[in-house]
Amino acid sequence: VTSFASAYLDDYNTYLGNLKLIDSNIDPEEIFDNFTIEIKDVSGEEMSTSAFLVELIMSISFTYIIMAITLAAVNMATSAIAVEKEHGTLETILTLPMTTNELIMGKYLANVVIGSIASLIGFVLTIVSFSISKNMFILYEDFSISFVAIVWGVVICILASFLISGVATLITSSAKTYKEAQAAGQILNYVCILPIFMSYLEFTVTTTYYFIPVLNYTTILLELYTGNFEYMNLLITIGSTIVYSVLIIWFMFKRFKSEKVLFSS
């Protein structure tokens, strides 16, 4: 009752103020409406508030999918490398009939598997959530998913796991202890948050943007599910990820040849 009375008195106060302005031959709109708000997408086209909210929520959802890969990969890499270095068990493992490259490749692929599982679980939950919301909220009534978009989305999630797992392995390999590895992995976690802040900025997405790891994954996933994607940008994202992943694997093999990296304590 109190809130209702306060709202009524506030409206009545505004009404009396407008009457005084009109009596003085002053248009109230010229006094109170000093600026207008227009919401536009990254292409500069005006969009409705509901469309903006849906795009923002989807951007945050896909960012969390990439973050899931990062968290899983960093934790796995920390356990597989930093913890074993701290406990001195890598020397024991290398007494087995395997090369250093085989050992590192196995740990890297384990990171990829864990990252892929985490991302696909998040991906499925996101799609299911939006599908359910479509039947419950007017805000999502225009949301639709094609089979092609789902397939490409799965491909992007798996490819992102290859790249992010490689970066996580490289970052944590320099650490001597579990705590150092966790601290180093936080850098990668912070990078994955960038797409959320980028969604608030007004800028034009160019072709170069799809060569930037992490940022391109969130963008291409968002475009896939808003129906605004181009196959050229999709191919650039896939191609650049493959190239980056190969370079990271090559650098890992070269880096882990050093005994200081393998057995630092």
What are the functions of these language-model segments?
Residues 105-134, 163-164, 168:
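Hydrophobic alpha-helical transmembrane segments that constitute the membrane-spanning cores
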Residues 144-175, 196, 240-249:
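Hydrophobic alpha-helical transmembrane segments of polytopic membrane proteins
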Residues 80-84, 170-176, 225, 242-265:
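Junction motif at the cytosolic side of a transmembrane helix
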Residues 48, 126-152, 227-228:
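Membrane-interfacial helix-loop-helix connectors in multipass membrane proteins
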Residues 1-72:
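Transport-system extracytoplasmic interface segments
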Residues 64-89, 169, 173:
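A hydrophobic alpha-helix feature that marks transmembrane segments and, especially
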Residues 175-211:
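Transmembrane helix segments
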Residues 203-227, 235:
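Short hydrophobic, aromatic-rich alpha-helical segments embedded in or entering the lipid bilayer
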